[in-house]
Amino acid sequence: MKESGRKRRVKNKPNLNYGVIVENRRFCYMVLGGTRDIVQGELRRKLRHQMKELAHPKKDEIHLTYSGPLKRLLSIRTAQSVFVRRDFKISRPRTLLSPENMSDLVNWIRSVSQLTGNCWNSFRIDAAGSQSPTMLRIADAIENALELPYDPDEGDGVLAMRPGELGWELLCRIGTRPLATRSWRKIDYRGSLNAAIAANLVFMTQPDPGDRVINIMCGGGTLLIERLLIEKVVFAVGLDVSSSAVTATSANTLGASVQNLINIVRCDAKRSGFANSIFNVVMIDLPYNTVGSQRLGNRELYLQVIREAARLCEIGGRAVMITDDHSALNFALSNLKDDWKVMDERIITQRQYRPTCLLLRRI
């Protein structure tokens, strides 16, 4: 084997062949815990009769067959990533080393790579025992056949392998990055939301082109940008007290080409100065800290910010908010029972991060 990924191509830029039509292939969308129903809803709206859902035991994945434009397949905003799936009727990975199976495997990987203009610079294998002698032999065979360096740590082409019901399931990711990685993000502001989580929050509000939206504590603008890329608005405001947040939001809205649709304001989220009931949708990415003394301070902060949100939101309007400080959130809402009614509460799981996401209705 070549020196385990040390060989490098000149970096290729993704060249997604959006015009290509895929025919009756199996795909797998990776989703975060707590978002499956929202992702399914987006898939059904966008892919419609061109998709057929497939039963699968993994709850953090959605499997389906699809025939149609690649562009539509990659337009899903709420999923983390999308893979092409291929089932091999083998009892163990070693069988892939046979000339017939390896030729089949390499041709399949090549066909997936071609969907993105052969933009991979290297590849890695995601599997139990990925550094075992058998897996390394498989990686070596793929590397030689595709002339693509194997990089077990940072390969941008991803091949997942695992046992399935009828043999082994192989999943090959489309593109060099997860779907949740957005090209519009020019400044990665500290604490910025995962963009797919933000898109899930947006769909929780049932976005409508007649909405008047404010994103309180907008940070780098992720929630606000995802809202504008999903549906039109009457007007939208991003609000943050931090000058660096305002700068980040400005840069990112420019990257998303929505800068003319947003008014970015630097002011105190507890006293915004806007008129009463001017908005019908409020989105809040609440800050949180892991240090105990700082978390105690969140209680009063959350109470004041969510009270201000109630002042800004018209009766019957909606609010979504996300935080990992469950105690401070519960404290604030217990003191604002006359202002808000909880319509949806869920915990979204992203590795060790388990924030509470709430949809509220103004009463």
Where would I find each of the regions flagged by the language model?
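Class I S-adenosyl-L-methionine-dependent methyltransferase catalytic core
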Residues: 2-47, 55-61, 66-72, 152-156, ...
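Non-catalytic nucleic-acid substrate-recognition regions in nucleic-acid-modifying enzymes
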Residues: 2-152
